[in-house]
Amino acid sequence: MRSWFVFVALLAVVFLPSSLDALKCIQCDSQPNRDECKTTLPEARDCPQTVNNYCFKTETFNKNGDLSMLRRYCNVLASTQNGCVDLPGGLGKKCEYSCNTDGCNSVTGLVASRAAYLVTLLPIIFYALSRQ
């Protein structure tokens, strides 16, 4: 009985905070010839309650392939494309990515999810339970 209590408590620690906390996303806009929002990023901030379902990263490239605009923000809906599309008239392309874990719209986009923590934690839990 005690082992199941420990197991349920650990699961709650892993999953409960994500449902209580607001999603934290990098929120910034690039300016021409400036580094902010490209590689120098602000801290991830709580998304407003009305748009706290997904983090977005939107990149716009000109016809020469140079990055002309970059936005990182919160949104209520996931991206319908999650990739790049050509802009009309051969003016360049627009790339859109959405994700739903804290800070996932950062430069690398490599942020461990709660599932990754759980996969790491489960063998430890089962080992501890089997030793009792």
From Swiss-Prot:
Disulfide bonds: none annotated. One of its GO terms (cellular component) is extracellular region. Contains 5 disulfide bonds. InterPro entries: Snake_toxin-like_sf. It is found in: Secreted. It comes from the Eukaryota. CDD domains: TFP_LU_ECD_Bou (cd23590). The scoloptoxin-05 family has remarkable similarities with the three-finger toxin family commonly found in snakes. Its main location: secreted. The keyword Transmembrane does not apply. This is U-scoloptoxin(05)-Er3a. GO terms for molecular function: toxin activity. Residues 1-19 form the signal peptide.
